[in-house]
Amino acid sequence: MTKTKAIDIIGAPSTFGQRKLGVDLGPTAIRYAGLISRLKQLDLDVYDKGDIKVPAVNIEKFHSEQKGLRNYDEIIDVNQKLNKEVSASIENNRFPLVLGGDHSIAVGSVSAISKHYNNLGVIWYDAHGDLNIPEESPSGNIHGMPLRILTGEGPKELLELNSNVIKPENIVLIGMRDLDKGERQFIKDHNIKTFTMSDIDKLGIKEVIENTIEYLKSRNVDGVHLSLDVDALDPLETPGTGTRVLGGLSYRESHFALELLHQSHLISSMDLVEVNPLIDSNNHTAEQAVSLVGTFFGETLL
């Protein structure tokens, strides 16, 4: 990422990939926490493209025990629209910063981005692998499947968005501490570069990020997408997210990680997902998210 590249902020207020209302308010909460002014203070050209239009939530259906893939038609609609917006951003030579919404929106964003690169790398900063397939998913929640879909396995209509699948060997998972059985097997079968919380405890976040950067460079990637799920952070510090897992990354560790990623100039696009202000405390999680994004784009104390 160059320092002069303009940024498109694109909201994707989807709540359909999981079961807790409120994550659709994530883009609003993040903007309210000062994202735009924070980035403009860094002398960046910032274009807020607003939110894509998403289907209305049918409360009765949303809370029902749906069989199979939950809210599938709505998720197709959201990701088709987001795919077009993100693709247009790249065609205009801008850096797409996508605000979720739940993590199912990464299908639309990353599939759009991958069309414009020959060998895209992906950093998945998350407590979860999001590598389930419908047949193995314990919940049917599609926010647990986007990365598997992006590698070329999953529901037909979502796969159709993805004409240039992500190679498993171009993926780095950071912050893992909750993986389903099928996800663990997929990671082992494809030898996906993975840093669990145990690895981070042993190595430290500095070495983890430096190893990530060197690994992706060795893969000769021509772009890297950063998908940052705030549930990667420990919920005792960062409570406003729907799939909390204790023992996560600290805010300080994440701050330093994003500082190192900024210095690498490797990242060409970004998602920020799973901020849910309805289960937050005084918009604290959105404020942390804004601070992390500011760090990623070059904000420093001195």
From Swiss-Prot:
Q: So where does substrate get bound?
A: H128, G129, D130, L131, N132, S139, G140, N141, D180, T243, E274
Q: List ligand-binding residues for Mn(2+) 1.
A: H103, D126, D130, D229
Q: Where does Mn(2+) 2 bind?
A: D126, H128, D229, D231
Q: How is the cofactor bound?
A: Binds 2 manganese ions per subunit.
GO:BP terms for this protein? arginine catabolic process to ornithine; urea cycle
In alphabetical order, the GO MF annotations are: arginase activity; manganese ion binding
Keyword line:
Arginine metabolism, Hydrolase, Manganese, Metal-binding
Cofactor(s) essential for the protein: Mn(2+)
For the keyword Cytoplasm, the answer is no
Hydrolase: is it a keyword of this entry? yes
UniProt-listed Enzyme Commission number(s): 3.5.3.1
Q: What class of enzyme is it?
A: hydrolase
Identify the GO cellular component terms for this protein.
Answer: cytoplasm
Pathway per the UniProt entry: Nitrogen metabolism; urea cycle; L-ornithine and urea from L-arginine: step 1/1
Which domain of life does this protein belong to? Answer: Bacteria
The similarity comment for this entry is: Belongs to the arginase family.
This protein is called Arginase
Which gene underlies this protein? arg
